[in-house]
């Protein structure tokens, strides 16, 4: 009598991926990687010279992932060294220090450098990016709040995590989500799955929130010229209110931006006869 023995499910093939770190010097790129791979924090700062390379293995679902990590020096001096390592990358860890505004402002420059080195045929849409707002343990010195960092990341369809290499906060969760997204990319034919969060608000809303956040006065906040009439102020306010009202806009920082617009309108109308 024959019995039907169920076939054993063959394990999924191992996957080899390439990951690079990007960001200014001293933002904690190497410390984040060491915290995850070696479960330790190195308090003494040792600048990365050119490129640090490491290999680690992780398990994602039922699949073994062999990760080649290229930790790139952030100092401009090492551009000629790191520019060879952008190609054939599946994942990017983009790091800034929440206490250094310059490191946050430099994120766009890092993306521009990568785009330039990939050349006209390079496609950054097929790479998983995760933004690490690092050193959140230094809360007293923080100058880039979570909503500003999250807005920048999500407006580009990037993952975003608050991290501390010193305490380990957010590190494991970040890497797990990061690797899972890369596996999804590879299983999706090399195309990055659309991040649901990036579709929840428009570029216009994101750009407007940034403009309001960086405005020097109430006139600039509403986008009207100094000395504008009451009608012009109200018209500008209504347009912004429709765009940013918390009931309609879910972009990070929208509620604060809306309140700022309300206060700006009130302040201007007090001085307009």
From Swiss-Prot:
Keywords: GTP-binding, Nucleotide-binding, Nucleus. One of its GO terms (molecular function) is GTP binding. GTP binds at residues 23-30, 71-75, 134-137. InterPro entries: DnaJ_domain, J_dom_sf, P-loop_NTPase, Small_GTP-bd, Small_GTPase. Its main location: nucleus. It is found in: Nucleus. GO terms for cellular component: mitochondrion; nucleus. Residues 217-273 form the J domain. GO terms for biological process: positive regulation of ERK1 and ERK2 cascade. Residues 1-18 are annotated as: Required for interaction with MAPK1. SMART domains: DnaJ, RAB, RAN, RAS, RHO. GTPase which can activate the MEK/ERK pathway and induce cell transformation when overexpressed. May act as a nuclear scaffold for MAPK1, probably by association with MAPK1 nuclear export signal leading to enhanced ERK1/ERK2 signaling. Interacts directly with MAPK1 (wild-type and kinase-deficient forms). Interacts directly (in GTP-bound form) with MAP2K1 (wild-type and kinase-deficient forms). NCBIfam families: small_GTP. Belongs to the small GTPase superfamily. Rab family. This is DnaJ homolog subfamily C member 27. It comes from Mus musculus.
